[in-house]
């Protein structure tokens, strides 16, 4: 499908939500966990689509809240691009996601939706008496600062 339709796809492998272990950590008859088996499938499915950058068109969703599994999955899926949710508000950290990148600091896209969108709540500057324009400015500035902090924290742990 990726080749035929010139599209990319991301497959849920090890997600960041707290209940993910109910399914993803189940042990199969082979002794593997479900997420490990899915990782092998993803790497195999993408084998025919590896481009000049060394990555396939079949990516994996690997949650920032599972840093040890993420590091092991990077070794298991060296040609797979990772989409990494769960950074920030869900507890994922720059140090924790560092192992999900390749040796050159590539191969992963880290997402922090709530941490950036909701940064204004942590600012302590919001007041119900603010004008709408001031509130929008606060939201924008807080989001900008949260994004910069995330960028700086990731840069500090990547090559």
Task: Explain the meaning of each model-derived region.
Residues 26-33, 60-64, 134, 141:
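A short glycine-/small-residue-rich loop at the edge of a beta-strand within enzyme catalytic domains
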Residues 4-58:
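Conserved anion-binding
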Residues 39, 43, 70, 94, ...:
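Generic structural signal for well-ordered alpha-helices
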Residues 42-47, 73-77, 151, 155:
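Surface-exposed amphipathic alpha-helices with a cationic face
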Residues 60, 64-111, 115-125:
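A C-terminal functional module that forms or caps the active site or interfaces directly
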Residues 97-103, 118-159:
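C-terminal helical cap(s) of enzyme catalytic domains, especially alpha/beta-barrels
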Residues 5-6, 28-33, 79-82, 101-104, ...:
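Short, low-complexity, polar/charged sequence segments that are solvent-exposed and flexible
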């Amino acid at each position: 499908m990726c080749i035929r339709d010139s599209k990319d796809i991301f497959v849920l492998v090890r997600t960041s939500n707290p209940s993910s272990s109910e399914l993803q950590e189940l042990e199969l008859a082979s002794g593997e966990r479900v997420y490990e088996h899915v990782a092998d499938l993803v790497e195999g499915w993408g084998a025919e689509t590896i481009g000049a950058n060394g990555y396939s068109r079949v990516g994996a969703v690997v949650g920032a809240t599972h840093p040890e599994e993420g590091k092991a999955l990077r070794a298991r899926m060296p040609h797979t691009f990772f989409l990494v949710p769960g950074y920030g508000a869900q507890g994922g950290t720059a140090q924790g996601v560092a192992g999900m990148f390749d040796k050159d600091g590539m191969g992963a896209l880290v997402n922090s939706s709530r941490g950036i969108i909701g940064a204004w709540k942590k600012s302590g500057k919001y007041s119900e008496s603010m004008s709408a324009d001031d509130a929008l400015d606060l939201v924008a500035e807080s989001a900008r600062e949260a994004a910069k902090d995330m960028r700086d924290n990731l840069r500090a742990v990547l090559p």
